């Protein structure tokens, strides 16, 4: 008799996605981040659910309710810090996952890639709204500054911002709706992730060489299930080390005082994982220009399949492109550092140069390098 996992309508979907899935025999640890992102999402939904049981989305009690969670709720402190640092681990995995896609040409699967970019946007929106919820100083001012960017949109900007705020400033209505959205978005992300997988399984996984692996497939289970479990253990080890030894390492001390609309913090900055985009935003001395650059810094990923000029899919055998890729990584790290610095000399000019370099690398230098490499193949 055929195994139930191959016949049952629901189980066979799971079977075809995680058990009998034909996978390339040579995918490296860079292919672990997809499953790690799934684990991060589940962890965030679970910890978030327990936090929501004790949190109150009201300007007068939000900050106190978070304090109450940490002091009075059984293991509330660990749930809170797992959620906060879980977001950091989520973004580390996201950046690694996207970087892998760029390096090995995974963006050639356009549907999968585009859903991935939408997932990135959705995750960034969710994290931003989550940061507002504790209602500390940086929560309030971060929300004020970022939502205010929409006022740069011609004609409808001001109305749009006041519509999002639900008033004339960030206040109770804003906090309540941000909580509602922050709660629903992870489920939308989960649904999109399933669509992401659906499209991926139409083509099968890419591999480090970028060459078709149809001639050499192995079953996902047990080979990659055991490999994924190792990745998950390392992820949990890193997360719990952070949570138990240095839970506030990645946070901003300015978010410890409760929100005060009458007192602006000296340096308004977002969480570390948004700093690269924040640096690009600040490097343009024009409001609308900065907003456009901010959006384009992520939206540019959509263009990757169009910017691919190489005859080879992966960068594995393309040393010039490899060099430029790692320069891009260094550039993003520079932008991340600049985003956390005050707006003064020499940080302003460094940020502007790094921003120009970012767009130049992706739009001009990398496609040019690919064309040069194509010509070198003829020698």
From Swiss-Prot:
Q: Which domain of life is it from?
A: Eukaryota
* Annotated positions binding heme b b566: 97, 196
One Pfam family from the record: Cytochrom_B_C
Q: What is its main location?
A: mitochondrion
For activity, the cofactor(s) needed are: heme b
The answer, when asked if Heme is one of the entry's keywords, is yes
According to its UniProt entry, one GO biological process term is: mitochondrial electron transport, ubiquinol to cytochrome c
Cofactor: bound how, per the entry note?
Answer: Binds 2 heme b groups non-covalently.
Q: Which residues cross the membrane?
A: 33-53, 77-98, 113-133, 178-198, 226-246, 288-308, 320-340, 347-367
- List residues binding heme b b562: 83, 182
Entry GO MF terms: metal ion binding; ubiquinol-cytochrome-c reductase activity
What the entry lists under InterPro entries is as follows: Cyt_b/b6_C (IPR005798), Cyt_b/b6_C_sf (IPR036150), Cyt_b/b6_N (IPR005797), Cytb/b6-like_sf (IPR027387), Cytochrome_b (IPR030689), Cytochrome_b_C_euk/bac (IPR048260), Cytochrome_b_N_euk/bac (IPR048259), Di-haem_cyt_TM (IPR016174)
Q: What does this protein do?
A: Component of the ubiquinol-cytochrome c reductase complex (complex III or cytochrome b-c1 complex) that is part of the mitochondrial respiratory chain. The b-c1 complex mediates electron transfer from ubiquinol to cytochrome c. Contributes to the generation of a proton gradient across the mitochondrial membrane that is then used for ATP synthesis.
Q: Member of which family?
A: Belongs to the cytochrome b family.
The name under which this protein is listed is Cytochrome b
Point out the gene that encodes the protein: MT-CYB
């Amino acid at each position: 008799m055929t195994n139930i996992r191959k016949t049952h309508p629901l189980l066979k979907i799971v079977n075809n996605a995680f058990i009998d899935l034909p996978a390339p025999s040579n995918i490296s640890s860079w292919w672990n981040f997809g499953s790690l992102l799934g684990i991060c999402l589940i962890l965030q939904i679970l910890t978030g659910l327990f936090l929501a049981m004790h949190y109150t989305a009201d300007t007068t009690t939000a900050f106190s309710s978070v304090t109450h969670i940490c002091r009075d709720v059984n293991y509330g402190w660990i749930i809170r810090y797992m959620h906060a640092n879980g977001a950091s681990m989520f973004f580390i995995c996201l950046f690694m996952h996207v970087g892998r896609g760029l390096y090995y040409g995974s963006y050639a699967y356009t549907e999968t890639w585009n859903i991935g970019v939408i997932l990135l946007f959705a995750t960034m929106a969710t994290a931003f709204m989550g940061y507002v919820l504790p209602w500390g100083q940086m929560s309030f001012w971060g929300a004020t500054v970022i939502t205010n960017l929409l006022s740069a949109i011609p004609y409808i900007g001001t109305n749009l911002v006041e519509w999002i705020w639900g008033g004339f400033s960030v206040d109770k209505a804003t906090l309540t709706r941000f909580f509602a959205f922050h709660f629903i978005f992870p489920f939308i992300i989960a649904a999109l992730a399933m669509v992401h997988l659906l499209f991926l399984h139409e083509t099968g996984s890419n591999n480090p060489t970028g060459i078709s692996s149809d001639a050499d497939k192995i079953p996902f289970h047990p080979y990659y299930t055991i490999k994924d479990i190792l990745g998950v253990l390392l992820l949990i080890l890193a997360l719990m080390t952070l949570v138990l030894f240095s839970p506030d390492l990645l946070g901003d001390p300015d978010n410890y005082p409760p929100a005060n609309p009458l007192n602006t913090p000296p340096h308004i900055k977002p969480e570390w994982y948004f700093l690269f985009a924040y640096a690009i935003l600040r490097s343009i001395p024009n409001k609308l220009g900065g907003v456009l650059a901010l959006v384009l810094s992520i939206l540019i990923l959509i263009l990757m399949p169009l910017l691919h000029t190489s005859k080879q899919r992966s960068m594995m055998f393309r040393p010039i492109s490899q060099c430029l890729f790692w320069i891009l990584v260094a550039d993003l790290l520079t932008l991340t550092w600049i985003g956390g610095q005050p707006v003064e000399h020499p940080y302003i000019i460094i940020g502007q140069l790094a921003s120009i370099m970012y767009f130049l690398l992706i739009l001009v230098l990398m496609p040019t390098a690919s064309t040069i490499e194509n010509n070198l193949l003829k020698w």
